Amino acid sequence: MKFNIIIVFISLAILVHSSYAANDNDDDPTTTVHPTTTEQPDDKFECPSRFGYFADPKDPHKFYICSNWEAVHKDCPGNTRWNEDEETCT
């Protein structure tokens, strides 16, 4: 009985290791997909700080959320505009 349990654990360890090894191939190109709400403009927005909410300088109905220096372009709902002082659409 003890021998059977050891065999099961060894088999499981080999199976888990081989599945991780199969996914760890540096020769395969990888693609990372980042969801966005709207397309980035040609002149990409640069976050002025690591985290925060910032007005779109070209459109008062849009704004950017910066997280770890990455900008995500967002639309204000309805006919609202980005309010820089309140950091929300009003």
UniProtKB/Swiss-Prot annotation:
Residues 22-42 are annotated as: Disordered. Its main location: secreted. The keyword Secreted applies. Keywords: Allergen, Cytoplasmic vesicle, Disulfide bond, Endoplasmic reticulum, IgE-binding protein, Secreted, Signal. Gene3D superfamilies: Chitin binding domain. Non-allergenic peptides derived from the C-terminal IgE epitope-containing part might be used for immunotherapy to desensitize individuals with mite allergy. Residues 1-21 form the signal peptide. Residues 44-90 form the Chitin-binding type-2 domain. Monomer. This is Major mite allergen Der p 23. It comes from Dermatophagoides pteronyssinus (European house dust mite).
